[in-house]
Swiss-Prot record:
The keyword Zinc does not apply. The keyword Repressor does not apply. It holds the Pfam family Mago-bind. Keywords: Coiled coil, Cytoplasm, Nonsense-mediated mRNA decay, Nucleus, Translation regulation. Signal peptide: none annotated. One of its GO terms (cellular component) is exon-exon junction complex. The gene is pym1b. This is Partner of Y14 and mago B. Belongs to the pym family. GO terms for molecular function: ribosome binding; RNA binding.
Length: 192
């Protein structure tokens, strides 16, 4: 929107205008070389100018050749060109993979999962047949049982000394398992 200038013998003026409420604005003097704010071009740095001036076609290619090249380009089957136009190479590859999965059908993955679930699972220590792994497993169990036995003994001492006046149900259950823990510990120590 260019501002209408009025030229007079004393210089350029922006003419007096009437406001919507009926009052008048004063005419304003405009200096030589003044460019109104709305007419000032937007600043563009060198990078932007370079890419605006850069041709869309590769060097040496005519616009007719470009049309032929676009027609020869193959799109992804089953997907319109407009969908893949702005996608990166990786995104296009992922879309191809999705298409393949759709074509294979959802049942192929389900059958593989069912077969995996139906196979009997075994203890990882037995599957490896690694004596050091089995020994480590036993050592871990022995350590765990010794810790539980130590906790039971500490609880019994606290009850005997009167530190704990009334034992809770969980504490009584723990005391009741003391014999089973000792038997399990003895059995593991005999096996090793």
């Amino acid at each position: 929107m260019a501002t209408p200038y009025v030229e007079d013998e004393s210089g350029k003026y922006i003419a007096a205008t009437q406001r919507p409420d009926g009052t008048w604005r004063k005419p304003r003097k405009v200096k030589d070389g003044y460019t109104p704010q709305e007419e000032v071009p937007v600043y563009e740095n060198k990078f932007v100018k370079f890419f605006k001036g850069k041709p869309d076609l590769p060097p040496g290619m005519s616009p007719g050749d470009e049309a032929q090249a676009r027609q020869q380009q193959q799109g992804i089957p089953g997907i319109a060109e407009s969908e893949t136009a702005g996608l990166s190479k990786t995104a296009k590859r992922n879309m191809k993979r999705k298409e393949k999965r759709k074509l294979q059908g959802p049942d192929s993955n389900v059958e593989a999962l069912i077969n995996a679930v139906e196979m009997p699972t075994s203890n990882p220590a037995e599957a490896t047949n690694d004596p050091s792994g089995a020994a480590a497993e036993k050592a871990k169990k022995i350590k765990n049982l010794k810790k539980k036995l130590r906790q039971v003994e500490e609880l019994q001492q606290k009850l005997d000394s009167g530190e704990i006046k009334q034992a809770t149900k969980e504490q009584l259950d723990k005391l009741g398992r003391a014999k089973a823990i000792q038997d399990g510990l003895l059995q593991l120590e005999e096996d090793s």
